[in-house]
Structures are given as structure tokens and as C-alpha cells.
Amino acid sequence: MYALLLMLILADGAALPGTWKGRISDLKCGAMVDTACNRRCIEEGQQAVLVEDETGEIRPINNTDFVKKYAGAHVEVQGSSKDGQINVRVVKPLDK
């Protein structure tokens, strides 16, 4: 029953809730996280991304303005994911 429900949700393209840990970067710099550069690029209009700790995957963040003050920081984000992009609802800075 749960498997069927999950298949229907995924087939519909619904956003799935989740929690991810990583560093906030920007689309131009990607996995090359540099706080000053990331801040500058995001201020200039680049989309924010999360570089995941475990996989190194670069996940675009839909609501860049919500996370821009954390550029270059190691964070845990909570939100939802759809089509590989994260819509962040909560940001928790992590120890360096």
C-alpha cells in the first residue's frame, strides 16, 4: 500500500520533504566553495546551490534569497525537493 502511494507521488512529480547537509555555493562556482566569491556571485544574480556533504552532488536552490546570507557556510537545510532542486524552508549553520 505504501509503495503504491509513493509511486503515485513520484509519478505526479510532487515535491518530497527532506534534510540535506552541505555547503552553500553558487551555480557558477559549483563545488569550488569560496565564501567571498560565493557571496559576490550570488549578489550578482547567480543561483545558490547546495554542495552535498555525502555525495558532492550540486543541488540548485529555488529560493536563493532565503539562503544568500549563508554563502560559503556549512549548513543543514530542510525543505522539499522536486526535479532535483531544493526549496529551502529552514537553514541551520553547522560547526566548521
Model features per residue range: what roles?
Residues 1-13:
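Classic N-terminal secretory signal peptides
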